Structures are given as C-alpha cells and as structure tokens.
C-alpha cells in the first residue's frame, strides 16, 4: 500500500516538474525562415528546451508566460567560427602568460552567456585549451548558460601556422 502512495507521489512530482518546464512565448511576429513569411500574433510553446508547437493568437497554459507581443521573434543564429575561450583584445597576448585555466574558464563562461544573449543559439568552436569542452559539458548539464557548442577541442594547424601557440613568440621563450 505504501508503495502505491509513494509511486503516486513521485508521479505527481515528476508531472509538476514537467509543467514547470513549459514556457509560452506570446509573439507579436515570428519570422518563418522555412516558408519566407512573417507570422503575426502567435504563441510558441516550449517544453524543456524544445519547441513543441506554435499556436494561433496569444495563448496561456500551466507554465511561464513571456509577453513578447511588441516584438519580432526569429530563429537563433549559428556562428560557425568561434574560440569561446577568448576574444581579441589589446591584452590577449599578455593573457597567454598571465591567465591560468580557471581564469580562462570564468572568462569563457561570460563569453558563452553573452553569445547566447546576442541571439547565437549554436556555435562551432574551432579549438582551445580544453576549457571549451568543459564549458560545453557544463552548458549541456544545465550548470551554466550558453549556446549549444560543437567543438573541435584542440585547434589543428602546422608548425608556425595560426594554431601554433609559439607563433610570434621570442625564440628564447619557446623552449624545445
């Protein structure tokens, strides 16, 4: 008898978790890239991290409702060439000598979140130190916010080429 009540209780908890993961985006306009049309007054129903359906009008249900009635919603962008661990800056070469892996990880997390908030839902990372892989895993596990990352892990290149970490360094500093 206790097992039946426990099972019913667990089913109720899981149903509540599923309902909590449903989001209703009330959109003024949606850009339909597949058909080349602009759809007006639609509701996008998102369950977990998947678009479940698009409904006519502004609908509500059991879950979070986000009012975007004054906005145009479009599919996420894909950036096919990023290095999520860093950005071009006046201090980028100095940072190769001063930042450790933990510093790079914090910086990469901030870059990933900013990338997602800029509309890029997917990126192709073309190489890093390994932080890129850990960041991808953390995003996939819901630990941090960021885009879907497809990564090459380490950059590939020839000696002296773009991916050679000793490129442009003083010969005495390079080692063997």
Write out the residue ranges for each language-model feature.
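Extracytoplasmic
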Residues: 25, 39-41, 60, 103, ...
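Short coil/turn connectors at secondary-structure junctions
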Residues: 20, 62, 143-147
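Hydrophobic/aromatic beta-strand patches that form the interior of the parallel beta-sheet core
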Residues: 25, 64-66, 150
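Histidine-rich, glycine-flanked metal-binding segment
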Residues: 30, 35-74
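Envelope-exposed proteins and targeting segments
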Residues: 26, 40-42, 119, 145
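Metal-associated gating/positioning segment near the N- to mid-region
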Residues: 72-141, 159-163, 171
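Metal-coordinating catalytic core of metallo-dependent amide/deamination hydrolases
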Residues: 143-176
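Bacterial Sec-dependent N-terminal signal peptides
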Residues: 1-22
């Amino acid at each position: 008898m206790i097992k039946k009540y426990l099972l019913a209780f667990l089913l109720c908890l899981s149903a509540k978790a599923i309902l909590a993961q449903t989001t209703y985006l009330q959109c003024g306009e949606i850009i339909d890239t597949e058909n080349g049309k602009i759809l007006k007054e639609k509701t996008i129903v998102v369950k977990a991290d998947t678009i479940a359906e698009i409904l006519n009008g502004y609908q509500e249900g059991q879950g979070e409702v986000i009012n975007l009635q004054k906005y145009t919603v479009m599919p996420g962008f894909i950036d096919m060439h990023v290095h999520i661990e860093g950005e071009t800056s006046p201090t980028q070469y100095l940072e190769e000598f001063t930042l450790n892996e933990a510093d790079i990880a914090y910086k990469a997390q901030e870059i990933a979140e900013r990338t997602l908030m800029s509309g890029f839902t997917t990126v192709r990372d073309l190489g890093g130190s390994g932080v890129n892989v850990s960041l991808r895993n953390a995003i996939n596990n819901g630990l941090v916010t960021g885009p879907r990352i497809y990564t090459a892990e380490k950059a590939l290149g020839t000696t002296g080429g773009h991916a050679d970490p000793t490129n442009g360094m003083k010969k005495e500093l390079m080692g063997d």
